[in-house]
Amino acid sequence: MVSLFGILNIGSRGISASQASLDTTANNIANANTEGYSRQRTVQQTLDPLVTANGVFGQGVNVVTVERIRNRLLEAQVREALGDTNFNQQMGTILAQLESIFSDPLHSVSSTTETLYAGGLNDLISSFFRAFQDLSTTPDSPELRVAAIESAQALAESIVSKSQQLITLRMELNQQIGTQVQTINQALQEIAGLNGAIRSVEAGGNRNANELRDRRDLLLRQISELVPVQVEEGSEGMVRVSIAGQWIVDHTSANPLVVETSRNEDGIDLVGIRIGGQGLHLIDNEVRKGKLGAILEARDRLLPALSEELDVLARGVIFEVNRLHSASSGLVGYSAIRSSLDVPSRALDSNSTMTLNRVFNEPAPGSRSATGNRPYPIQDGEFTIRVADSGYQKQDTYSVKVHTDDTLAALVSRIDRADG
């Protein structure tokens, strides 16, 4: 049978348990708008009963601990979703920048006859070919010649401008990589410190470091917004964090990311990411989520592809214009023409065995061009030479065949023999 003193103790313990629950509820209300805060609740447990000859009597209630209401599986899914969401948002921002580059507003280009209006590349290309089409109908018109030249200049300047803007955007993305890596490293250091603090607090048994765990989970979320991470929690409450299978937090030790910068032959900075002292480099294939993943995807894949497309466009326009231009004549004839491209002097030696393919197509030392020293590869075919007198009253036409295995001296000799 419970004594009066026992009854008072049971009541006291009940009041204390209720007070603890009220305190926990008040704390929940106070932190309702606190970022990363997890709602808490008291865990109550009945005390061991008093066993007597007259029966078994309860001894009241006791608060065992205060725990967070948190689901680890859902937390991992949230981190996964944050990576996807922020990847798409960052990529959307980058695509908007690219849209502004390639969909520029209307701007004026001065002309001797009129003001031409051009928008994006499509409009400029259309204006360019329209100007040459007009010129083809009246080739001796000075006004149309000026208009054709100006449309060509506008197109060339636009392509160069867009190419430079892509380089500038790449540099901006490199800077963002450095900034985000710094943010990640700061979070990693704090997580490693929180691991040690959580272990110390919870080493006493039923104590839960709820606020410390909330802070750590918030940091893990923030990192997941930037880069995909995998999280494992051990028996002591400490977590290990990895990227692409490599640890960046191992209990109380952080293994920070390192930004490495080099410069290529074109003077463009190349920024890479390495994991701490392990010398392991991260590439975009390993980081396909988060803002950092979007930046790497855009910098290493999207921008180079767009730059290459611009180069292909420029080469195509240049090739076609030069092809048509080479078959035409100017208002004033030439008595001599000097090429802007040079060849090795030894290739002109009559005893030289250097073929045209080697002279024109093989890359020079240090060259990265797939077509060697020239913008276009030489191919088997023929070209036409037209010779006219000073008044254009008489013109002779000669065709000269070209083979890639010819020597330059042989080609010169073939040209000399063309007129018989």
Predicted regions and their residues:
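Structural signature of extracellular appendage/secretion-system components
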Residues: M1-G420
